[in-house]
């Protein structure tokens, strides 16, 4: 909830191959003025951690002076809820007095606590102490001001100031976001993302080892998306230039999240390349530094799966999880591709050799590049098709990415029908883009979601080759998103699922165990802009039909169950809204939503205009 909690943010500038940052240690912080302005200095010298060396030295000339935090869009409190504030402080020149923590709104106090400050005797070392305060909200407010003040004149130093609601799952994850994610019933979670792994430069790439251990020892890093869409017109500097990574959620927390939502973890690793779209930087394979990237991969597996007394397994155990996380898959690079100067295939081979020398059971994910239409894609598949027959575990699946218009998805529901079956596919990043840009919740239309649902009928039909699939991106904060569409949008008060979210949810909740052949009927239906797939859940005996009606009128789908016989009423779940351009938003989160009804299978399936229908029919044979 607090922004720039360690006084370590930077302001980001630049363009391809030329990115740089300026110090912004005090970004988001200001002195209060009600009792006169205290002095705020951002200093270094004796930090709580050398990793984040800057901290605030605050001097109050009079009692009651303090400082407040921007906190993104301000603090949101819900009446009756408790919020825990933690911070490190050191009484540099503060022989008496306490520290007050408040959330205020328009001058009135909405939550408050006072903590006793630890005062060291004169002429002794003043050490850092960790403080904790519980704030109970007296009312529900938005745009509140988080404030810390001194009850007496003096100088106190502060660092790592945090505020979390007490209902945060595992003390880390915002509950409404967690519930939405768990509600998808995901089979796996790919983290921490794509381009973030690579970085604009190798200096700001995501280093998993910096994201584990004590929170105070995690280095703040600027975010690759802080410089998205910079240009000469905006001075190579956008409104998101202070987008930094505090690593409050690191690899330990990601593994824990996977465990809590019942998903397999799929971490992605850097292969010694910065983002190929934004940089020319790389570590040559014959340089000693390249070995560090290989070692990071091997050490990650030990961190996830190693014994509690191993080097990296002990780090996991110390953080509270002595049992292994059960990692089975690792992504080798993000959107990497082969060029005259970059031998990505050689890098993949080096990682495969290093990992499988110690962990032959780990499944590796390769990369087909940034798209599925260029020569990068063709070259990648030539490489994997050549290598996989010689060694079964060389590559578990090849990661394909496509952000395309809805029409492409409709036209390519048969995309995987003719794929060879010897090398598997991971549809690692995909989304329908009716429109795209920054901060566009309206980009997540019903029409876009229906196109994704139609495409997924083909993915599911070819589940023998497409073994993994994931929509991207997952989360977007309203007013802070550099990319649209996204699956789940939220602000400081609430979160909601988009039409695409409900498509993913319906697929996640209705996974069959066997895909059934439609004997070419799917091709005939496509001519009528109806897209379908049928599967069987052998555990329950249910036939599961997934059908998209891409028409402005209602359709009825007649059913012939063949050797199956209906053993009960069909249950239908329907996703639709007021036309293809309908979308959900913070103000109207249910414009596109699910509805349920029952029907007789003998009467067929009624498909409302512009809808996605999932029907479960209990059967016997």
Put a short name on every predicted segment.
Residues 1-246, 264, 282-291, 341-342, ...:
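Extracellular and organelle-lumenal recognition/adhesion modules and their flexible linkers in secreted
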Residues 87, 185, 258, 300, ...:
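Conserved, mostly hydrophobic/aromatic
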Residues 138, 166-186, 246-261, 288-329, ...:
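An active-site-proximal structural segment forming one wall of the substrate-binding cleft
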Residues 150, 192-195, 271, 276, ...:
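Active-site groove signature of glycoside hydrolases
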Residues 312-320, 356-377, 424-429, 465-476:
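Aromatic-lined carbohydrate-recognition surfaces of secreted/lumenal glycan-active proteins
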Residues 353-356, 387-392, 396-510, 538, ...:
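Catalytic-core region of carbohydrate-active enzymes that cleave or remodel glycosidic bonds
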Residues 529-566, 572, 610-613:
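Carbohydrate-binding surface patches
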Residues 591-621:
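C-terminal beta-strand-rich structural cap/linker in extracellular carbohydrate-active enzymes
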């Amino acid at each position: 909830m607090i922004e720039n909690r360690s006084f370590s943010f930077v302001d980001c500038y630049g363009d391809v191959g030329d990115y740089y940052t300026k110090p912004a240690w005090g970004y988001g912080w200001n002195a209060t003025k009600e009792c006169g302005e205290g002095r705020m200095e951002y200093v270094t010298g004796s930090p709580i951690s050398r990793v984040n060396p800057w901290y605030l030295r605050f001097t109050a000339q009079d009692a009651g002076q303090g400082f407040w935090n921007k906190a993104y869009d301000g603090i949101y409190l819900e009446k009756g809820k408790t919020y825990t504030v933690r911070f490190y402080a050191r009484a540099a020149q503060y022989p008496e007095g306490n520290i007050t923590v408040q959330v205020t709104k328009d001058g009135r106090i909405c939550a408050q606590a006072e903590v006793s400050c630890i005062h060291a005797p004169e002429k002794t070392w003043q050490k850092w102490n960790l403080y904790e305060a519980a704030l109970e909200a007296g009312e529900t407010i938005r745009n509140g001001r988080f404030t810390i003040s001194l009850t007496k004149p003096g100088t106190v130093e502060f660092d790592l100031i945090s505020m979390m609601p007490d209902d945060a799952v595992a003390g880390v994850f915002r509950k409404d976001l967690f519930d939405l994610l768990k509600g998808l019933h995901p089979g796996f979670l790919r983290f921490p993302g794509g381009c973030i792994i690579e970085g604009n430069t190798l200096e700001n790439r995501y280093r998993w080892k910096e994201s584990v251990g004590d929170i105070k020892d995690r280095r703040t890093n600027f975010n690759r998306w802080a410089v998205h869409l910079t240009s000469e017109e905006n001075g190579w500097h956008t409104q998101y230039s202070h987008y930094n990574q505090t690593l409050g959620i690191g690899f330990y927390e990601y593994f824990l999240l996977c465990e809590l939502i019942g998903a397999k973890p799929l971490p992605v690793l850097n292969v010694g390349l910065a983002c190929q779209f934004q940089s020319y930087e790389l570590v040559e394979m014959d340089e000693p530094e390249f070995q560090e990237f290989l070692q990071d991969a091997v050490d990650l597996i030990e961190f996830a799966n190693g014994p509690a007394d191993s080097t990296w397994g002990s780090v996991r155990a110390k953080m509270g999880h002595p049992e292994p996380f059960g990692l089975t898959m690792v992504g080798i690079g993000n959107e990497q591709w082969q060029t005259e100067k970059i031998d990505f295939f050689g890098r993949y081979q080096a990682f495969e050799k290093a990992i499988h020398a110690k962990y032959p059971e780990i499944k590796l994910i390769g990369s087909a590049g940034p798209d599925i239409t260029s020569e990068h894609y063709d070259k990648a598949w030539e490489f994997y098709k050549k290598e996989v027959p010689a060694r079964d575990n060389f590559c578990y699946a090849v990661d394909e990415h496509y952000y395309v218009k809805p029409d492409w998805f409709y036209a390519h529901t048969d995309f995987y029908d003719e794929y060879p079956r010897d090398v598997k596919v991971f549809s690692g990043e995909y989304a329908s883009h009716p429109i795209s840009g920054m901060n566009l919740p309206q980009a997540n239309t019903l029409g876009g979601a229906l196109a994704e649902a139609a495409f997924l009928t083909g993915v599911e039909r070819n589940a023998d080759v497409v073994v993994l699939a994931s929509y991207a991106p997952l989360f977007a904060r309203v007013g802070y998103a550099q990319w649209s569409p996204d699956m789940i949008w939220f602000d400081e008060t609430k979160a909601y699922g988009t039409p695409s979210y409900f498509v993913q949810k319906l697929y996640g909740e209705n996974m069959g165990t066997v895909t059934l052949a439609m004997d070419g009927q799917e091709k005939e239906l496509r001519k009528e802009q109806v897209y379908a797939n049928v599967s069987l859940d052998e555990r329950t005996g249910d036939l599961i039909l997934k059908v998209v009606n891409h028409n402005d009128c209602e359709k009825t789908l007649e059913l012939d169950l063949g050797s199956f016989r209906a053993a009960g009423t069909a249950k239908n779940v329907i996703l639709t809204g007021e036309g293809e351009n309908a979308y959900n938003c913070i103000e109207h989160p249910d414009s596109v939503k699910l509805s349920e009804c029952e029907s007789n299978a003998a009467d067929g399936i009624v498909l409302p205009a512009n809808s996605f229908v999932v029907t479960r029919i209990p059967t016997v044979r």
